Amino acid sequence: MKEKKSYTELMKSRNTQKTKEFDVTMTDIYIQMVLDESLYNRRLAMLTDQINKALDEKDKDAFLTLSKEYAALKQSE
């Protein structure tokens, strides 16, 4: 014969599952935030290096393009 669970046991089990799903979702959000921050910082560092290189080479067009991109990225912060 099958073992039947009471209504209370079923609800407790269901709430536990929902909590676990919520925890996974929050973990995923946190991981995404860390990755986004890392990519943002890396892009800023790359743009800074490219801007410095453009200044060293006196490349005005590259400097203007890169500095606009840098400013837009900083503004989106």
UniProtKB/Swiss-Prot annotation:
Family matches, as InterPro entries: IDEAL_dom (IPR014957), Virus_scaffolding_prot_C (IPR027393)
Gene3D superfamilies: Virus Scaffolding Protein, Chain A
Name of this chain's protein: Uncharacterized protein YhzC
The encoding gene: yhzC
